[in-house]
């Protein structure tokens, strides 16, 4: 019997206390890793959204500069969000905010501004508003502005151009959404054709 008892005491393995301590330590380590991964993932998403917002803002400014810089005439009587004529193709154009981002629309000088943002028939084709920056480039974000104006000194000024996350954005209350990127309050773009006289 003594031989049997000695054998049992010398058996390799864990006691119940050692096993429970090991399980407890492993569960604490696992919980820490899982929590850390979710925090890192959330931080990465925030950084990625801010970077995408800066890219969208830069792309939008480049597109706006392409449109504004080549204007050759301005529609008179519209101090805010005026229509302007592009040199390329001789088309009148108007910019507008929409639920999908900033859109531009080809129109005639005599078109009713109340129709902007809707389908308008011009000469032989129906022109729908088109996004200034494609949906793919927007990456779930939306660019929005308060207004743009034209001054007789030859500058278009866009006011409060900013980027929001599209999900949950309400255009009627933009102040309720987080701004991911923005330009200074007023950003001016020079018209390369000089000072245009409103028509």
Region spans (language model):
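Short, well-structured beta-strand/strand-turn elements
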Residues: 69-78
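Type IV pilin-like appendage domain
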Residues: 77-157, 164-169, 175-178, 182, ...
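Aliphatic-rich helix starts adjacent to a transmembrane/signal segment
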Residues: 2-4, 14-69
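Short coil/loop residues immediately preceding or within conserved phosphate-binding loops
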Residues: 11
